[in-house]
């Protein structure tokens, strides 16, 4: 998930912020806005599901909405810790591979087991990195760093179209390289 900022200003007719947006702390910094949660195919890197929530929603609470139902494996960062124990995940066939918190790895004694665990976490991180590419396209190439509208519904609708266009950007090479795309 990524945070998309909303204007925190109260200089409007109602003298209030958007009531559907909330604030959250990321690292040591506070942000006001919404969160975009996405599900990405590990092999192609294309987005298959999008959920927009207030910024104070946890990542793990939206995990069930990010699955399309045919996954065998699902990868998540440390924000998805405990996802397999949640009620809405019961009966889903996906096996979750969640990143360990850094403090757990640091607390281990140096040795072969720690080195093996670090290598396993590195492999999980390489797969999870595919999720960050659509966020890069949306925020850096399209410049969508702040929400444009009031309310989650309108902003989530815009996220659907932006991630659809991001899929075209990410699949550009495959689309142009396929022989079917060349007119005869």
Q: What is each residue range found by the language model?
A:
Residues 118-119, 124-126, 162, 169, ...:
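Acidic, contiguous segments within the catalytic cores of piggyBac-derived transposases
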Residues 138-141, 168, 172:
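Generic structural signal for hydrophobic core residues of well-folded globular domains
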Residues 1-95, 101, 160-166, 174, ...:
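Polybasic low-complexity intrinsically disordered regions
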Residues 150-156, 173-184:
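Short alpha-helical "patches" and their helix-cap loops
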Residues 72-73, 78-153, 157:
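Helix-centered, glycine/charged polyanion-binding patches within enzymatic domains
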């Amino acid at each position: 998930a990524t945070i998309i900022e909303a204007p925190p200003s109260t200089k409007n007719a109602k003298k209030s912020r958007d009531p559907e947006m909330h604030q959250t702390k990321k690292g040591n910094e506070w942000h006001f806005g919404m969160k975009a949660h996405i599900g990405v195919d590990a092999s192609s890197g294309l987005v298959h599901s999008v959920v927009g929530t207030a910024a104070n929603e946890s990542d793990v609470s939206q995990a069930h909405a990010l699955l399309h139902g045919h996954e065998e494996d699902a990868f998540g960062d440390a924000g998805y810790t405990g996802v397999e124990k949640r009620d809405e995940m019961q009966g889903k066939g996906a096996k979750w591979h969640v990143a360990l918190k850094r403090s757990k790895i640091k607390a281990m004694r140096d040795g072969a087991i720690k080195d093996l665990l670090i290598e396993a976490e590195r492999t999980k991180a390489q797969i999870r990195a595919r999720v960050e590419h659509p966020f890069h396209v949306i925020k850096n190439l399209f410049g969508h760093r702040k929400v444009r509208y009031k309310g989650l519904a309108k902003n989530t609708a815009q996220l659907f179209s932006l991630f659809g266009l991001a899929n075209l950007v990410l699949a550009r090479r495959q689309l142009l390289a396929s022989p079917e795309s060349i007119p005869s």
